[in-house]
Amino acid sequence: DDALALAYAIAHPNLELIGVTSTYGNVTVPLAVRNTLALLELLSNDNIPVFAGPSPDGFRPSDISAFIHGHNGVGEVLLPPATTQAQPQPAAEFLIQAVHEQGDDLVIIPTGPSTTIAAAMQQDPSFAANSHLVMMGGALTVPGNVTPWSEANISQDPEATDYLFQHTHDTTMVGLDVTLRTLLTTAESGRWRATGTHAGRIFADMVEYYIRAYATTSPH
């Protein structure tokens, strides 16, 4: 789903993607960075900079993450190694700089744990006051997907998410209440495959792996 978010953001005519920060969750940060660089190159947008975020010591993805997303995080699809590298600047520093430079034109869209966002808020209090966030995570009126009380992104670093909510001035939470109503089927992936492009096939393969996994875990 994060790979699709990248693709849709790049394709949207009214959006300019100025950078991507990679975090842990379904995979480790180094693997997330490699995947992001490879996907941007696949989408002919390898000029977009990628920044590595922080990660807890000894982090290992869960077995259920590997089952749903594949051990490589992209449905076991083999992506050609990217020819570019991540930026040396830490992700939190990039976000702080971007908010100062872009102002109200910038919207940050976290789709993983809140660790990087909380780090930026702690490093620069003005980041919390001036950033606009639309985050994927949480569950308000429905059960969680890790435990009945916990959603996957929030559960990775609940302390960071608590810090975010305590200090943010403008955050929209898009939780399971919304995302569970958003359906993607093999009809859509079939249309991508039918384009005959390399990117279309890659994204169809990724999504169909995801669909098969959820057909097992959530057959309803």
Where are the model-predicted features located?
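N-terminal acidic, glycine/proline-rich low-complexity segments
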Residues: 1-220
